[in-house]
Amino acid sequence: MKQLSELKARIDDNEIQSSVRVPQMLFGNEELLIVYAVGNGMTGFGINDGDTLFISTDREPKSGDVVMAKADGQTFMRQILVNEERGTYILHANGVEKRDDIETAEPEVFGVLTFILKKYAA
């Protein structure tokens, strides 16, 4: 079983739609991905449909972190948990949409959730 720090993946430049400069004063010097949440599978972690998520590609993932990861050919926002007994990782969903957890030997981790910009709904 690989250490969490060994699971980091690189985003293919072809997958990046656009880039923006973010204020250093607010976000520091970290490399960030900005993605939009789709669906309500992570509401238990404060992530709702339409929220803007800031993902740090510089931070090392730890068990319990919410990460952007790829498993079974799909990319997800999930909490990553280590199952040392089985030598696997669990990508845990927590929301109103009852999604199954994913157990995998080697997920590709793109980064760790750092900030959430909430969508205002009147």
Segments (PLM) and residue ranges:
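Flexible, small-/acidic-enriched active-site or ligand-binding loops
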Residues: 94-100
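Short, solvent-exposed secondary-structure boundary/capping segments
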Residues: 87-94
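Short, positionally conserved secondary-structure boundary motifs
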Residues: 1-43, 60-63, 74-75, 82-87, ...
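Structural motif
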Residues: 50-51, 65
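Hydrophobic beta-strand signal
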Residues: 34, 54-55, 68
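A short glycine-leucine-enriched loop at secondary-structure breakpoints
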Residues: 44-48
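Short hydrophobic/aromatic-rich beta-strand motifs
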Residues: 67-68, 80
